[in-house]
From Swiss-Prot:
Expression tissues: Highly expressed in cotyledons, leaves, stems and siliques. Detected in flowers and lateral roots, but not in the main root. Expressed only in the vascular bundles in apical plant parts.
Record annotation: effect of changing M159I: In strain: cv. Nd-1
Induction behaviour: By methyl jasmonate.
The protein's name in its UniProt record: Dihomomethionine N-hydroxylase
Enzyme class: oxidoreductase
Gene name of the record: CYP79F1
Phenotype of the disrupted gene, per the record: Plants have a bushy phenotype with crinkled leaves and retarded vascularization.
Lineage of the organism: Eukaryota, Viridiplantae, Streptophyta, Embryophyta, Tracheophyta
Organism for this UniProt entry: Arabidopsis thaliana (Mouse-ear cress)
Mutagenesis or variant effect for C43R: In strain: cv. Ag-0, cv. Br-0, cv. C24, cv. Ct-1, cv. Edi-0, cv. Kas-1, cv. Kin-0, cv. Landsberg erecta, cv. Ll-0, cv. Lz-0, cv. Ms-0, cv. Mt-0, cv. Nd-1, cv. Nok-3, cv. Oy-0, cv. Sorbo, cv. Van-0, cv. Wa-1 and cv. Wassilewskija
Amino acid sequence: MMSFTTSLPYPFHILLVFILSMASITLLGRILSRPTKTKDRSCQLPPGPPGWPILGNLPELFMTRPRSKYFRLAMKELKTDIACFNFAGIRAITINSDEIAREAFRERDADLADRPQLFIMETIGDNYKSMGISPYGEQFMKMKRVITTEIMSVKTLKMLEAARTIEADNLIAYVHSMYQRSETVDVRELSRVYGYAVTMRMLFGRRHVTKENVFSDDGRLGNAEKHHLEVIFNTLNCLPSFSPADYVERWLRGWNVDGQEKRVTENCNIVRSYNNPIIDERVQLWREEGGKAAVEDWLDTFITLKDQNGKYLVTPDEIKAQCVEFCIAAIDNPANNMEWTLGEMLKNPEILRKALKELDEVVGRDRLVQESDIPNLNYLKACCRETFRIHPSAHYVPSHLARQDTTLGGYFIPKGSHIHVCRPGLGRNPKIWKDPLVYKPERHLQGDGITKEVTLVETEMRFVSFSTGRRGCIGVKVGTIMMVMLLARFLQGFNWKLHQDFGPLSLEEDDASLLMAKPLHLSVEPRLAPNLYPKFRP
C-alpha cells in the first residue's frame, strides 16, 4: 500500500510535517483539558471514517475537490444520516436527517447556537461586529434585536415597498428592452442584477454606488455596480470553504492555505471600498449635520437608532460590517431559485402552464403583479419551495458550533464540534421525499391548493429555505418578496423559450457551486399589452 506522504508533491511534505506537529500539540492539549467520561451509549460519537494518527481525516479533506464532496461520499459509504469527522481533534458533525436536524435546531438549539471563529467569518464581520456570523453572545443578541425589531419590522419593510417596486418595474423594462434589440437573456445574470438593485435600494436608497450616478437608460448596471456585484459573489463563494485551515486555524492563520485568506481579504476590502463612503457620508449627515426630513432606507434606520439614554445604538463600524453581511446574504438565493425554477418549468411545460394560469386568474393581464398579490400565488410559491428542496443555493447551512457537550440522534457531540446540516442531503433524501429527484410543486400544496396559504419557510427541516432556530434567517419576509416577485414578473411579462444558438436545455448541476453547469440563455416575447411595460427609473 502506497503511503500518503509518498503520493504528495514535494512542497506538501514540509507543510504536512508542520501541520502534523502543530496538530499533535493541539490535540494533546484538547485531550488533557477534556474531562474523563464513562463509556456508555450517550458518550458514543456518531459513526465516521477511519483517520490518520493525530491528523484524523484532515489529509482526505485536503486532497478532495470540492471539499463538500468528501463529506457526501463518506456518508454514502457509511450508510448513515449523521457522521463524525475528526480534523486534528476538531469534530465535524454532518447531518442528512430531518429528524436529527429538527433536534439540532429545536431541542438542542441553545447548545448549538454558536458559530466557529474562523478567519473568513472574522474578516467579513470586521472582528465579529455583524449579526449572522458572530459568536453567540452580547454582540449577536444586540444586532439581532436591532435587525428584528427595526430593520425587518413590518413598518420598515412597508416603507421600502416603493423602492422594491421601482426595481421590479426596472426588471420588466430591462427585459423588454432586450426583446426590442433581439438580445438573448442570461437568466442568471439578470436575476442577480435584480437582487443587487433591490438590495442597494433598501440598504442605501439608490442602486448606484458612486457619486457620478452613471447608468444606462435600460436597466443595465454601470461598471462600478458590476464590479461591486462581482466582488460580493466572490466574497460569498469563500463561504463555506471547509479549508483544513478552518480546523487547525490557530497554527495555520497567516499561511493563506488554499489561498482563502487572500481571497476573502481582498474581496471584502473591495466591497467596503464601495459601501463605506456612502455610510461615512450618511453618518456625518445624520449625526453631525442635522439629518434629513425623514428616514428613507435601512442605512438611515441604523444610523438614527438610539438607546433609552439617548445614545446612538449602533456604531459606524457595526453598520459597515452589517452592510457587508446584508450584501452577501440577500442576492444569491433569489437568483439561484429563479434560474432553476424557470429551467424546470421549460422542461415540464405543464408546470409552466399551471403557473401562468394562476397568474392570469389572480392578477390578470390588465396590470402588473404586485407584492399584495403574493399571498394568493400559492402555486408559484410551491414552485419556489420545490426549487429550494431540490436545487439549494449551497451545500450546507452556515456552520453551527456546540457551546457545550450535548447529544444528537442519541450520539455524544463534544463541545467545540462544528455542526454541518446538508441541504441536498435533506431535500433529496428518499427517506424524506417520494421520488426526490422529480420536480413536483404539487407536493407542497395542501387540500385544494387555494384555501391554505403556502409559505417558503420549512419549519420541519425536510429541506432548508431560511433555516430555523436562534440562527434562522430573520429576513424571511423580504426574501420571500424578492423571490416571488422576481418569478412572478418574469412569467407574467414574457413568454420564454430556448434560444437556438445555445443548444438543448440542460439541467446538469455544477458539483461545486450547485448552479446550473450551463447558464440558462433564453429568448423572450411580450405577453402583455405594450402600455404595461414601464420605463427604466434610475
